């Protein structure tokens, strides 16, 4: 079997869509599973849509996600470089290569110059639509005499170069996900291969590059499926063997419509900025369109490499459910060390005004304890600012009717006084203090279960449910504990 070579070939036109990450990931996993090569090529032939810094941003996103490539465009010390023997790996640097191959197609009659104006093309499309026909090029320039073509070029007329598809012919190819696919050329357009600016279109460049870079499997989104017969035909007339095709299903929202920016986060950068962990996002996005053989849901990258197969990729769209992503991300947050999460959380706490940069050093251990208390509740790291308020206020108000009712219980004054005595007598509020104090109160006063824990929790946090009470007690510390109990005694009971 030939050595597997796959590529991820993004266009530098803006942010990295979550679907692009999945495409890159599937290419990466397939290469790893088959001891192959995973290449990153930049497709920048549409110069009108080029966004400065997009290549660098995309490479940083892939590096963050751990989807690393063996060959192609890399970022070293903020500088774009290329590595590998099949370069250049940036399409705008390959124009002479495309020129060589388009010349061959023209000479052999498989392509032709088209001088039609935009106005004429628009008029043709409008007439076709009005007649209920498929809008496509009408072949007006297909049979222009060579002498006419030469004269128009010499006169400086603008032109594109189109693929000359045969008429009424079925083109077949096999797709690993979809099986046998057949399309008739009567339903296809004479695709533009070279634009008026001299740059190739995607359809021409991708075939030339995939062949010259010896790509064995083209794994890409299903939006390219209708164009694939043109690519297969190009391989045929160029005398090349086509790669194996794999067209991935769309990523859908929970309403089963195509995921779009208007409905929420869709860029990898959105999830990075919120503090999603890379291993969680990769784990989740792998499952959007691919089904493992069992019901396992948590996968390390190594486990994905071992278990992934293209044969288990679905034909139908995969639903992106942010609640499921949050569940997986919360799993990884809980499994992470407090050191890791606190380092990620500090910028969000600073931005929200809970601590200053100057305070971080002396409060670091306390912040780590705080994260230890809260990390089980976090959907993503930035979510910490929605849970820390109770640890920074001097006075806490009950947050629900149930909490207010708990503060009316008859035994509350005696319970709070007993707890306050334990706090005042303690030399240090450490890991052991909370459990020890509660156990002693239970023994001395006879309060136990909800009658013991809930009133103290509400007095300290305003909530009847939450993280482990002894951990809350430790994080609040002696002075906060005293002030909060005192506030409840004076103002709430």
UniProtKB/Swiss-Prot annotation:
Binding site residues for Zn(2+): 114, 116, 141, 143
EC number: 6.1.1.17
Cofactor remark: Binds 1 zinc ion per subunit.
Record-level GO BP terms: glutamyl-tRNA aminoacylation
Reaction(s) catalysed by this chain's protein: tRNA(Glu) + L-glutamate + ATP = L-glutamyl-tRNA(Glu) + AMP + diphosphate
Location of the motif 'KMSKS' region: 258-262
Record-level Gene Ontology MF annotations: ATP binding; glutamate-tRNA ligase activity; tRNA binding; zinc ion binding
Chief location category: cytoplasm
Cofactor(s) of this protein: Zn(2+)
Localization, UniProt: Cytoplasm
A Gene Ontology cellular-component term: cytoplasm
Alphabetized CDD domains for the sequence: GluRS_core
Motif residue range(s): 'HIGH' region: 10-20
Residues that hold ATP according to the record: 261
UniProt cross-references to InterPro entries, sorted A to Z: aa-tRNA-synth_I_cd-bd (IPR045462), aa-tRNA-synth_I_codon-bd_sub2 (IPR020751), aa_tRNA-synth_I_cd-bd_sf (IPR008925), Glu-tRNA-ligase_bac/mito (IPR004527), Glu-tRNA-synth_I_codon-bd_sub1 (IPR020752), Glu/Gln-tRNA-synth (IPR000924), Glu/Gln-tRNA-synth_Ib_cat-dom (IPR020058), GluQ/Sye (IPR049940)
Record's keyword terms, sorted: Aminoacyl-tRNA synthetase, ATP-binding, Cytoplasm, Ligase, Metal-binding, Nucleotide-binding, Protein biosynthesis, Zinc
One Pfam family, short name: tRNA-synt_1c
Record-stated family: Belongs to the class-I aminoacyl-tRNA synthetase family. Glutamate--tRNA ligase type 1 subfamily.
PANTHER family cross-referenced by the UniProt entry: GLUTAMATE--TRNA LIGASE, GLUTAMATE--TRNA LIGASE, MITOCHONDRIAL-RELATED
HAMAP family: Glu_tRNA_synth_type1
Subunit structure: Monomer.
Stated role: Catalyzes the attachment of glutamate to tRNA(Glu) in a two-step reaction: glutamate is first activated by ATP to form Glu-AMP and then transferred to the acceptor end of tRNA(Glu).
Record's protein name: Glutamate--tRNA ligase
Annotated organism of origin: Alkaliphilus metalliredigens (strain QYMF)
């Amino acid at each position: 079997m030939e050595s597997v070579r796959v590529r991820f070939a993004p266009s530098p036109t803006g942010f990295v869509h979550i679907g692009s990450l999945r495409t890159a990931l599937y290419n990466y996993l397939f290469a790893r599973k088959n001891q192959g090569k995973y290449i990153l090529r930049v497709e920048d032939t549409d110069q009108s849509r080029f966004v400065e810094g997009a290549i660098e941003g995309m490479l940083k996103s892939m590096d963050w996600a751990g989807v690393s490539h063996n060959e192609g465009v890399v970022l070293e010390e903020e500088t774009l470089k290329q590595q590998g023997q099949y370069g250049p790996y940036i399409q705008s640097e390959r124009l002479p290569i495309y020129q060589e191959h388009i010349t061959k197609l023209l000479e052999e009659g498989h392509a032709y110059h088209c001088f039609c104006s935009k106005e004429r093309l628009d008029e043709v499309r409008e007439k076709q639509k009005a007649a209920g026909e498929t809008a496509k090029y009408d072949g007006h320039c297909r049979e222009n005499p060579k002498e006419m073509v030469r004269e128009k070029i010499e006169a400086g007329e603008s032109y594109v170069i189109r693929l000359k598809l045969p008429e009424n012919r079925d083109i077949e190819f096999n797709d690993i996900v979809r099986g046998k696919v057949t399309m008739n050329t009567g339903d296809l357009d004479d695709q533009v291969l070279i634009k008026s600016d001299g740059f190739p279109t995607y359809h021409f460049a991708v075939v030339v590059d995939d062949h010259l870079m010896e790509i064995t499997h083209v794994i890409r989104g299903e939006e390219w499926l209708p164009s694939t017969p043109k690519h297969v035909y190009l391989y045929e007339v160029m005398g090349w063997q086509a790669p194996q095709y794999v067209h991935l299903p769309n990523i859908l929202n929970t309403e089963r419509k195509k995921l779009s920016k208007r409905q929420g986060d869709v860029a990898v950068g959105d999830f990075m900025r919120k503090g999603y962990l890379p291993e969680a996002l990769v784990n989740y996005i792998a499952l959007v369109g691919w089904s493992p053989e069992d019901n396992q849901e948590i996968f390390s990258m190594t486990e994905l490499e071992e278990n992934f197969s293209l044969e288990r990729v679905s034909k139908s769209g995969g639903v992106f459910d942010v609640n499921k992503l949050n569940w997986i991300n919360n799993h990884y947050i809980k499994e992470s060390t407090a050191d890791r999460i606190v380092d990620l959380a500090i910028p969000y706490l600073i931005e929200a005004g809970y601590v200053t940069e100057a305070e971080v050093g002396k409060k670091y251990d306390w912040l780590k304890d705080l994260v230890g208390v809260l990390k089980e509740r976090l959907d993503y790291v930035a979510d910490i600012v929605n849970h820390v308020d109770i640890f920074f206020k001097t006075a806490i108000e009950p947050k629900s009717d149930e909490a207010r009712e708990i503060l009316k219980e008859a035994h509350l004054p005696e319970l709070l006084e007993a707890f306050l005595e334990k706090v005042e007598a303690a030399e240090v509020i450490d890991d052991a203090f909370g459990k020890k104090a509660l156990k002693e109160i239970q023994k001395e006063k006879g309060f136990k279960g909800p009658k013991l824990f809930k009133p103290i929790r509400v007095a300290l946090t305003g909530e009847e449910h939450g993280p482990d009470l002894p951990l809350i007690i430790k994080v609040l510390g002696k002075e906060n504990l005293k002030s909060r109990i005192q506030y409840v005694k004076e103002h709430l009971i």
